Amino acid sequence: MDRIIEKLESGWWIVSHEQKLWLPYGELPHGLAANFDLVGQRALRIGEWQGEPVWLVLQHRRHDMGSVRQVIDQDAGLFQLAGRGVQLAEFYRSHKFCGYCGHPMHPSKTEWAMLCSHCRERYYPQIAPCIIVAIRREDSILLAQHVRHRNGVHTVLAGFVEVGETLEQAVAREVMEESGIKVKNLRYITSQPWPFPQSLMTAFMAEYDSGEIVIDPKELLEANWYRYDDLPLLPPPGTVARRLIEDTVAMCRAEYD
């Protein structure tokens, strides 16, 4: 699936190493390979954007290596491809040797996988499913400040799905563990690939059922009900959390304005 980049090769360039992304001038490189000193490097075509190929190059650059978060405010499709590139680069870096027999592995030519020629084991990129849920109580939404986000941002509750658990069970468990309340009338809304490091966010809306807020201090700094027209600092646009909050606000406005 990979090829040597030629002089006239053009497109979008995802140059990644150790979960970092090369962002000269703060943007994804776009244009001729020669303009970015990429001629002769090996590249994988991982998709297409606006009619042009998107290439992944497994390489570290001395300068301008940043986080894929820096392109989150670009088009959702381009952010998704950048996230795919970073995750694939990390997958190839972390699967050089077979976890069963210890022998070297090589990339598949037909799919995103690493193959062991010794024991025939096949490895795929790991994806960690997560739930994220907006909880509404009349004209208010439950928002929390997470321990890992000490920047004043308040967001909806989220967490990883555990082994042997349905998405619905994960929502009920995470909400109870983090906030002490029960929810009802759960509705699936959308999903979003989230490459931090390798999650798939499954987004829901739910209604408050019962209980008083009792936070898990290992997860949350605080949590509270906020009226739809008096909200704290929110996650940035482009995140599924922001969409859930905005959709909840729109529903409240339709009923209470």
Curated annotation (Swiss-Prot):
Cofactor: Mg(2+); Mn(2+); Zn(2+)
Domain Nudix hydrolase, first and last residues per copy: 125-248
Keywords: Hydrolase, Magnesium, Manganese, Metal-binding, NAD, Zinc
Ligand binding (a divalent metal cation 2): E174
Gene3D superfamilies, sorted: 3.90.79.20, Nucleoside Triphosphate Pyrophosphohydrolase (3.90.79.10)
GO BP terms, alphabetized: NAD catabolic process; NADH metabolic process; NADP catabolic process
Binding site for substrate: R69, E111, Y124, Q192, P193, W194, P195, F196, P197, Q198, S199, A241
GO cellular component, as recorded: cytosol
GO molecular function per UniProt: magnesium ion binding; manganese ion binding; NAD+ diphosphatase activity; NADH pyrophosphatase activity; RNA NAD-cap (NMN-forming) hydrolase activity; zinc ion binding
Pfam families, per the entry: NUDIX, Zn_ribbon_NUD
Motif (Nudix box): 159-180
Reactions this protein catalyses: a 5'-end NAD(+)-phospho-ribonucleoside in mRNA + H2O = a 5'-end phospho-adenosine-phospho-ribonucleoside in mRNA + beta-nicotinamide D-ribonucleotide + 2 H(+); NAD(+) + H2O = beta-nicotinamide D-ribonucleotide + AMP + 2 H(+); NADH + H2O = reduced beta-nicotinamide D-ribonucleotide + AMP + 2 H(+)
InterPro entries hit by this protein: NAD-cap_RNA_hydrolase_NudC, NudC-like_C, NUDIX_hydrolase-like_dom_sf, NUDIX_hydrolase_CS, NUDIX_hydrolase_dom, RNA_Hydrolase_NudC, Znr_NADH_PPase
Broad EC category: hydrolase
Binding site for Zn(2+): C98, C101, C116, C119
Binding site residues for a divalent metal cation 1: A158, E178, E219
The enzyme's E.C. designation: 3.6.1.-, 3.6.1.22
Cofactor note: Divalent metal cations. Mg(2+) or Mn(2+).
Description of how the protein assembles with itself and partners: Homodimer.
PANTHER family per the UniProt record, alphabetical: NAD-CAPPED RNA HYDROLASE NUDT12, NUDIX HYDROLASE, NUDC SUBFAMILY
Purpose: mRNA decapping enzyme that specifically removes the nicotinamide adenine dinucleotide (NAD) cap from a subset of mRNAs by hydrolyzing the diphosphate linkage to produce nicotinamide mononucleotide (NMN) and 5' monophosphate mRNA. The NAD-cap is present at the 5'-end of some mRNAs and stabilizes RNA against 5'-processing. Has preference for mRNAs with a 5'-end purine. Catalyzes the hydrolysis of a broad range of dinucleotide pyrophosphates.
Family (UniProt): Belongs to the Nudix hydrolase family. NudC subfamily.
Protein name: NAD-capped RNA hydrolase NudC
Organism: Salmonella agona (strain SL483)
